[in-house]
Amino acid sequence: MMRQSVQTVLPESTGNNTLSLRDSVCRDLFQLFSSPHSPLPILLVSGMPEWQGHNQSDKLLQSWYCRQLRSALLFHEPRIAALQVNLKEAYCYELAISLEMMLYHDDEPLTFDLVWQKGSWHRTMPQ
């Protein structure tokens, strides 16, 4: 009987898989928000045009947005075990959100902040 050997290349271990998991999730979340071909509903990633004007202080609209965004993100990012979406600011042409999450296989909470300005999303550092 003849044996064949198959060579495989294993990914390099950085020694800190948690860090790479966190970086990967943040990178993929930012891609979900900023990609023109995002699977997220356009209403959730377009900075909520309804707020451009008189609705930015509408608490029901803000609550609806947070629930819809949370549901969509949990559907598209299976590495998130728990997620809370918070609106930090909602102005006419600016929207700031904070995603507070727990990842599977990670014991520390992860915060990911985004701001919608000038027609696109920008990542900010948590305070």
From Swiss-Prot:
Keywords: Cytoplasm, Stress response. InterPro entries: Anti-adapt_IraD, IraD/Gp25-like. It holds the Pfam family GPW_gp25. Its main location: cytoplasm. One of its GO terms (cellular component) is cytoplasm. It is found in: Cytoplasm. GO terms for molecular function: anti-sigma factor antagonist activity. GO terms for biological process: cellular response to oxidative stress; DNA damage response. Belongs to the GpW/Gp25 family. IraD subfamily. Inhibits RpoS proteolysis by regulating RssB activity, thereby increasing the stability of the sigma stress factor RpoS during oxidative stress. Its effect on RpoS stability is due to its interaction with RssB, which probably blocks the interaction of RssB with RpoS, and the consequent delivery of the RssB-RpoS complex to the ClpXP protein degradation pathway. Interacts with RssB. This is Anti-adapter protein IraD. It comes from Escherichia coli O6:K15:H31 (strain 536 / UPEC).
